[in-house]
Design a protein with these regions (language model features):
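Carbohydrate-interacting/catalytic domains
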Residues: 8-131, 155-165, 169, 433-436, ...
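Conserved, mostly hydrophobic/aromatic
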Residues: 29, 76, 138, 165, ...
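Substrate-binding/active-site clefts of carbohydrate-active enzymes
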Residues: 95-96, 118-130, 139-319, 601
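Conserved alpha/beta catalytic core and glycan-binding cleft of carbohydrate-active enzymes
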Residues: 287-289, 304-472, 498-554, 558-569, ...
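Alpha-helical packing segments of well-folded alpha/beta enzyme cores
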Residues: 160-161, 206, 210, 271-282, ...
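Short, flexible loop/turn elements at secondary-structure junctions
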Residues: 31-33, 57, 67, 139-144, ...
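Short, exposed "boundary/linker" segments that immediately precede the start
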Residues: 1-5
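A short acidic, glycine-rich active-site loop
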Residues: 196-200, 315-322, 431-433, 477-484
C-alpha cells in the first residue's frame, strides 16, 4: 500500500539484508508504554518468545521478518508497563482480519488487484454540490440472502445489488459500516478494524472488485465511518498496551454511556493520525467516493448523554469538545487536500453551526450534513391523521426556514425503520391503499424539496416489516401490485431527478427556490418552484389530504404551457389515476397569489377515488 506519513502499518516489504534484497513482512505497532512486544502467528506457533520487536523512540515497535507473505495470521503479544502479559491483540492497522473466535489479523498484499475505474475517477471532477445525488443506504448482510440463507458475498453483490441499484436509477449507494467488527448486532457501528473491509463477505480483492464494478457502471460508493468510539473487546484497542493509548483516560470523557464503548482521545496527536490514516486508506486503497461520519454530535459535546456531574467542561467552562472540533476540521482538510473529488457527510443531530461550511470560515469543513430536522418534522406530519394535518402545516414547511444554513441531504435512514418505529409504509395512517398513497406522496415531496436524497433499503418498494439485520428484505412483497407501484414510482423519481437539473443543480442556492403556495393549511397543500440554469423550472404540488380538489387555482410566475411529468397517483404506481385534468396546462393572465399568471388543475387525493 502507499506509504502513510500519518501512521505506520504492517506491510509486505523488500529489505536489504547483508546487501541482498529479501522479501518478507515488516510489522509495526504503536504501544508506547509496553515493556515488550512480539509478533505471534501461524509462522512461529503463536509463541511470543520467538519474534520480539524493537521499540523506536516514538513508541512504535517494528520488526522485519523475511519470508512471510500474504495469507498468514498474526497478532501481537504485549506486556504492559509492569511486565504483565495482555490478551493477544489484533493489529490496529491490519488490512484483513479473521472472524470469531480468533479475530486474528492476516498479512495482506494490496498489489494483486488491477483497477479499471479510471473513467469514473475522471467523471468525478467538478463541483460536488452541483451534481445529482440519490443515495441508496443499505446493510450488506441483510439486503438479500443466498439460497442457503447466507448473506451475499462482495462478488455476488457486485452482480445482484449492482443490477438492482442501476435499474432503480440511484446515483450512489451508502454502506452501513463494513469496517471489521466483532459483533454483527452492532450493524458495524462498533468497529475494531478501521483499515479493513470485513471478511464476512469475502477478501480484500473481492471488495475492490465490488467497488470497481460499481464505478464502471457509473455508481458511487459512500461508506459509513465511525471515528466517534470503539468497543471494549480485549483483542482490540482498549487499554492496548495496558494504558489508554487510544481512549481518554478519565471515564467522564472516555466512556460512552449509550453504547458501553470507549471514546477516542481526539486531543492526542497519535490518535488523530491513526483515525485520519484510516479515512485516507479507504479513499486511497479502496477507491471509495465518500465517507459519512457517524455520531458527530457525540463527538462535539462533552455532555452528550451525560447528566450534570458526569462530564468535565472545556477550558472555557463550556460543553464543546474543542479537541473533537479540531480533529474534524483536520479530517476534512486532509480529505479535501488529498482527494478533492471525495465527499464527506456528517450525521450531526444538533444545530451546531457551520458543519458543512469551509474550515477557512470557521466551519467543520464537511461537504454535506444529514437534515435530521426535516426527517423528524416531515415524518411526524405524515404520521398525523390527514384530518388533523392542517393544524401541523408548519411541520412540513419549517425546513425551508433553515434549508440554506447547511448543505443538507434529506435522509430517511435505517434509524427510522427499527427499534419499534415501524417501516416507512406502516408509519402512514389509513387503510392499505391510503398508506401506499401517503408513502408515494411523501417520496414525491422529498424528491421535490431542495437537498440531496437518501433512502434506506426496502423503503423503495414499501417494505412492510421493520428492518431486521438477521433477515433479508421482504422481496416476496414485489409480487403484489401495491409494492410494484411504489417501486416503479421510486424508479421514475430517480430517472426524472437525474434528467432535471432544476432538482439538483442549485440545491444550495436560495434564489433557486420559492414557495408558490405554502399557506393553504386548510387544504394541506404545498406548491414549490425549483429553478435550474437558463430559466429551467420544475413545479411540484402536493395534496396531503384524502380529498380531491377540482379546478384548484395556483399562481405561477411565468406564462406558457406547464406539462405534467410525474403524478404519484398514476395507476402505474397503484394510484387511483384521478389525473390532473390535463397533462398540459396553459397559464392564464389571471393574477393570483402575488403572481401575474395562474393555472388551474385537479389535485388527486391520498385516497381511492374514481
Amino acid at each position: 500500500p502507499p506509504r502513510s506519513t500519518l501512521f505506520p502499518y504492517t506491510t509486505l516489504f523488500r529489505s536489504d539484508v547483508d546487501g541482498v534484497k529479501v522479501k518478507g513482512t515488516k510489522f509495526a505497532v504503536y504501544a508506547p508504554s509496553a515493556t515488550a512486544v512480539s509478533v505471534i502467528g501461524d509462522f512461529n506457533f503463536w509463541d511470543g518468545r520467538r519474534l520480539p520487536m524493537a521499540k523506536s523512540l516514538l513508541g512504535h515497535w517494528v520488526l522485519f521478518v523475511p519470508g512471510l507473505g500474504a495469507g498468514l495470521r498474526y497478532k501481537y503479544e504485549i506486556k504492559d508497563p509492569f511486565g504483565n502479559r495482555l490478551p493477544h491483540k489484533a493489529d490496529p492497522v491490519g488490512f484483513y482480519h479473521e472472524q470469531y473466535p480468533s479475530f486474528a489479523s492476516i498479512i495482506s498484499d494490496h498489489r494483486t488487484y488491477t483497477w479499471h475505474d479510471a473513467e469514473w475517477q475522471k467523471s468525478q471532477l467538478g463541483n460536488k454540490l452541483e451534481r445529482p445525488m440519490s443515495i441508496y443506504e443499505l446493510h450488506m448482510g441483510s439486503w438479500k440472502k443466498s439460497e442457503n440463507g447466507q448473506p451475499l458475498t462482495y462478488r455476488e453483490l457486485a452482480v445482484d445489488l449492482l443490477d438492482y441499484v442501476k435499474n432503480m436509477g440511484y446515483t450512489h449507494i451508502e454502506l452501513m459500516p463494513i469496517m471489521e467488527h466483532p459483533f454483527s448486532g452492532s450493524w458495524g457501528y462498533q468497529p475494531t478494524g478501521l483499515f479493513a473491509p470485513t471478511s464476512r463477505f469475502g477478501t480484500i480483492d473481492d471488495f475492490k472488485f465490488f467497488v470497481d464494478t460499481f464505478h464502471q457502471n457509473g455508481i458511487g460508493i459512500i461508506l459509513d465511518w465511525v471515528p466517534a468510539h470503539f468497543p471494549t473487546d480485549a483483542f482490540g484497542l482498549a487499554k492496548f498496551d495496558g494504558t489508554c493509548v487510544y481512549e481518554y483516560e478519565d471515564p467522564r470523557r472516555g466512556w460512552h454511556p449509550d453504547w458501553n464503548s470507549l471514546i477516542y482521545d481526539f486531543g492526542r496527536d497519535t490518535v488523530r493520525r491513526f483515525l485520519i490514516a484510516s479515512a485516507l486508506i479507504w479513499l486511497d486503497l479502496y477507491h471509495i467516493d465518500g465517507l459519512r461520519v457517524d455520531a458527530v454530535a457525540s463527538m462535539l459535546y462533552w455532555d452528550y448523554s451525560r447528566k450534570e456531574g458526569e462530564w468535565i467542561p472545556n477550558v472555557d467552562g463550556g460543553n464543546i469538545n474543542y479537541e473533537a472540533v479540531s480533529f474534524l476540521k483536520w479530517f476534512n482538510e486532509e480529505v479535501n487536500r488529498k482527494h478533492p473529488n471525495a465527499v464527506t457527510i456528517a450525521e450531526e443531530s444538533t444545530a451546531f453551526t457551520g458543519v458543512s461550511r469551509p474550515t477557512s470560515t470557521g466551519g467543520l469543513g464537511f461537504n454535506f450534513k444529514w437534515n435530521m430536522g426535516w426527517m423528524h418534522d416531515s415524518l411526524e406530519y405524515m404520521q398525523t391523521d390527514p384530518f388533523f394535518r392542517k393544524y401541523h402545516h408548519g411541520e412540513m414547511s419549517f425546513s425551508m426556514i433553515y434549508a440554506y444554513n447547511e448543505n443538507f441531504i434529506l435522509s430517511i435512514s435505517h434509524d427510522e425503520v427499527t427499534h419499534g418505529k415501524h417501516s416507512l409504509l406502516y408509519k402512514m395512517p389509513g387503510d392499505e391503499w391510503q398508506q401506499a398513497a401517503n408513502l408515494r406522496a411523501y417520496l414525491g415531496y422529498q424528491y421535490a424539496h431542495p437537498g440531496k436524497k437518501l433512502n434506506f433499503m426496502g423503503s423503495e418498494f414499501g417494505q412492510g416489516s421493520e428492518w431486521n439485520d438477521n433477515a433479508q428484505l421482504d422481496w416476496w412483497l414485489l409480487k403484489y401490485p401495491k409494492h410494484q407501484g411504489v417501486q416503479k414510482l421510486v424508479q421514475d423519481l430517480n430517472e426524472m431527478y437525474k434528467k432535471e437539473p432544476a432538482l439538483w443543480k442549485r440545491d444550495y442556492d436560495p434564489d433557486a427556490f420559492r414557495w408558490l403556495d405554502v399557506n393553504d393549511a386548510e387544504h394541506s397543500i404545498f406548491a414549490m418552484l425549483r429553478s435550474g440554469d437558463d430559466g429551467d423550472c420544475i413545479m411540484a404540488v402536493s395534496n396531503f389530504t384524502p380529498v380531491p380538489y377540482v379546478a384548484y387555482r395556483l399562481g405561477v410566475p411565468t406564462p406558457g404551457t406547464y406539462k405534467v411529468i410525474l403524478n404519484t397517483d398514476d395507476k402505474k404506481y397503484w394510484g387511483s389515476g384521478y389525473g390532473t385534468g390535463s397533462d398540459e396546462i396553459v397559464a392564464s393572465n389571471i393574477s393570483y397569489q402575488n403572481n401575474y399568471h395562474s393555472i388551474v388543475l385537479d389535485l388527486p387525493p391520498i385516497d381511492r377515488k374514481s
